[in-house]
Amino acid sequence: WEKDFAQEIADDRMKIVSIHTVFEGHRHQSLSRLKKFVKATGFGHSVGHDRHDVSDEYPNTMILYGTRGTPEVAIIDKEGLIAYQRIGFFDVEEKTQMIRDLMAA
């Protein structure tokens, strides 16, 4: 979507954010490994590392947004409400049109 919406991102009308949520294998999936991965893949958007308090079963973002696993995508509208959320496969072309429709609204 970074390429499809390059102008909207440049005009600060759209943001793409990834959140690395670790719900197992915490020692292996560290913040330092994430930073290396992001640098190696050349992501052009912000990537956050989900905070996990040892007293909680799940990381903070999973608790706050009710995410269930990876990969999971959420499209958040102009009011900050979740317009679409899905775990696993989704139709990219269909969701690209959905984003265009939300931006036009």
List each model region and its residues.
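Structural microenvironment flanking redox-active thiols in thiol-disulfide oxidoreductases
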Residues: W1-T41, H52-N60
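A general secondary-structure boundary signal
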Residues: A6, L31, H45-S46, E72, ...
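Thiol/disulfide oxidoreductase modules built on the thioredoxin-like
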Residues: T41-F43, H49-M98
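Non-globular targeting/processing and membrane-anchoring segments
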Residues: M98-A105
